[in-house]
Structure formats: C-alpha cells, structure tokens
Amino acid sequence: MVKDTTHSILEISTIHGKSSVTGSKIFRPLKIFALEKNKACHLVFSNYGGGFVEGDSIDLTIDCKADTVSAFSSQANTRIYRSEHGKTCKQTITGTVGENALVVFMGDPVVPHQKSIFEQHLFWKLEKNAVLLVIDWFEAGRILNGERFAFDSFFTELKIESNGVPIVWDRFKMDPSQNNMNSPGAFLDHSSYINIFLAGDENLTRVKSIETQLRFLAAQYFHEHIENKSESLIRIGSAVKVNEQVFMIRCSAKNNDLLQPFVKALAEHMSDKELLGFNPFEGRN
C-alpha cells in the first residue's frame, strides 16, 4: 500500500522582537523540535525511526515572516534506509524568507544506505532584503562499514527565487548502477560532498559577513596551487561569486570527517549577534 503524503506546515513570526513558531501542523514521519535561542528561532528536524523508511514522504511548507531570524538543523545524519520493494523516499520543502528575514538551513549529511532510493526538492522564495544560507550535504553510505555508493538512486534539487526571479537552480542525480561513481569525472576516491549557497543582496550587512567568512574558510581549506598532489586529493573545493545575489561553495572529500571542520567553523560564525546569535551546531562532537 502506498503511504498518503500529508502536508506539514510551519509558520515563524516576530513577537515582541523575538522570532517564534506561531503556527505548525506536523505529520509523520517528520518530527520537529523548537528551541528558544535568544531572539532567534531554532528548529531541529528528526524522523520517527531515525531516518527515511521505504516509501516515506515528507511535504513541508515553511513561512518565515518579515524580520524573523531562523535556523533549521537536524539531530543527526539523515539516513535513507533500504528499499525492499522499489519505493522512493521523498522530501519536499517549500520555504519563504520574508522581508529583512534571515534563514540558515544547516542540516547534517544525507546518508543513503544500500539499495535505498531518495528524492529531495528544496524550493525557497526570498522577499526584499531577505538572506538565505543553505547547506546541501551528502555521504555515499555507511563508509566505515565498507558500504560506498551502494544505493539505487539519489536525486536532489535546490531552487531559489528572489522577488520572483530564479537565482539558483541546482539539480544532481546519482544512479550507481548506470554510472561509474569512481570515475575521475564523478567522485574518484571521494565519498562526500557539500554545496553551500548564500543568497541575498550583496550589499546587505549579513551577506557581507557570511560571504567574508566563507571566503576565509575556502582560503584555509582549499588551495588553488597545489604542491603535493597526493595530499590535495583528500579534499577538493571551490568558492564562486555567481552574481550580485549568490555566492557558492562546492567541495568533495574522501570522507565526511574532512568536511566537518569547515561546517563547524561556519556554524560558529553564525553566533554573531548580527546573524543568528547562536551556534546551530553547538554541543556537537
């Protein structure tokens, strides 16, 4: 039997200078915990069963009203479990970032297990002077158990619009049975990747602050001129100013541990009082 797709809703508004959840309707398999963090709102995603079980479907609409400050993270890696009957696990998140609002979407990696099928769609709309930071993070299975690119299919899509105009449309599909993931044109010996998108007017103070930190971290972790090629292969990345509204980082690595320091340093920067005012990864190992 195909599971019904039930539409979940989150609304975040500013009340007396503080961002709070003012409306929610959440259905299985999704769980969301709301944490109070000074003037910002911190929402933590989780799942019943610790991940996506065959056929699970999440359809979530997020409305972050004007002047709100919100962070979305996860309890742990998002695991996609084995599909015994060829059913797809699917996640669709449609979000609005209101005027002068800030949203930081910073979850842990998606980890597709052997024989799993996963499809993800992230759609965000930005209003005037809104800022959005999105992290899209992936690891190719239970690497420590020797499982690597053993899933059946993985698809992810991110689309961002600003004032009704698309400024990001990023799509990526992996089908290991049809493609050689160890090819130099794919992952070679890497098993993890991370994409970071910063969207918002480049003249905004928040955008300048986050972009400066991203450039600093890119200079620290990525190298344009490599002397020792064997060392360079553990992590490869690039930082690109796409246009006046988008700054982007792409990075792949041999394993997730090599990407953790980059993300943790970025999360720590979010504790600036002009941004979130707290670290969404605080307390992590």
UniProtKB/Swiss-Prot annotation:
The keyword Nucleus appears for this protein: no
Subcellular compartments? Cytoplasm
Question: To which species is this protein native?
Answer: Cytophaga hutchinsonii (strain ATCC 33406 / DSM 1761 / CIP 103989 / NBRC 15051 / NCIMB 9469 / D465)
- GO molecular function ontology, one term from the record: nickel cation binding
* Assembly and oligomerization: UreD, UreF and UreG form a complex that acts as a GTP-hydrolysis-dependent molecular chaperone, activating the urease apoprotein by helping to assemble the nickel containing metallocenter of UreC. The UreE protein probably delivers the nickel.
Where are the membrane-spanning stretches? none
Q: Does the keyword Lyase apply?
A: no
Q: Which PANTHER family match?
A: UREASE ACCESSORY PROTEIN D
Signal sequence: where? none
The name this protein carries in UniProt is: Urease accessory protein UreD
Q: What is the role of the protein in this entry? A: Required for maturation of urease via the functional incorporation of the urease nickel metallocenter.
Identify the InterPro entries for this entry.
UreD (IPR002669)
> Which Gene Ontology cellular component terms are annotated?
cytoplasm
Q: Which UniProt keywords apply?
A: Chaperone, Cytoplasm, Nickel insertion
Family, per entry: Belongs to the UreD family.
